[in-house]
Amino acid sequence: NTEAFFGQGTRLTVV
């Protein structure tokens, strides 16, 4: 459950 944000609103959610 880790959320990472990159650049312009790109969201990567890893459980």
UniProtKB/Swiss-Prot annotation:
It is found in: Cell membrane. GO terms for cellular component: T cell receptor complex. Keywords: Adaptive immunity, Cell membrane, Immunity, Membrane, Receptor, T cell receptor. It comes from the Eukaryota. One of its GO terms (biological process) is adaptive immune response. The keyword Membrane applies. Alpha-beta TR is a heterodimer composed of an alpha and beta chain; disulfide-linked. The alpha-beta TR is associated with the transmembrane signaling CD3 coreceptor proteins to form the TR-CD3 (TcR or TCR). The assembly of alpha-beta TR heterodimers with CD3 occurs in the endoplasmic reticulum where a single alpha-beta TR heterodimer associates with one CD3D-CD3E heterodimer, one CD3G-CD3E heterodimer and one CD247 homodimer forming a stable octameric structure. CD3D-CD3E and CD3G-CD3E heterodimers preferentially associate with TR alpha and TR beta chains, respectively. J region of the variable domain of T cell receptor (TR) beta chain that participates in the antigen recognition. Alpha-beta T cell receptors are antigen specific receptors which are essential to the immune response and are present on the cell surface of T lymphocytes. Recognize peptide-major histocompatibility (MH) (pMH) complexes that are displayed by antigen presenting cells (APC), a prerequisite for efficient T cell adaptive immunity against pathogens. This is T cell receptor beta joining 1-1.
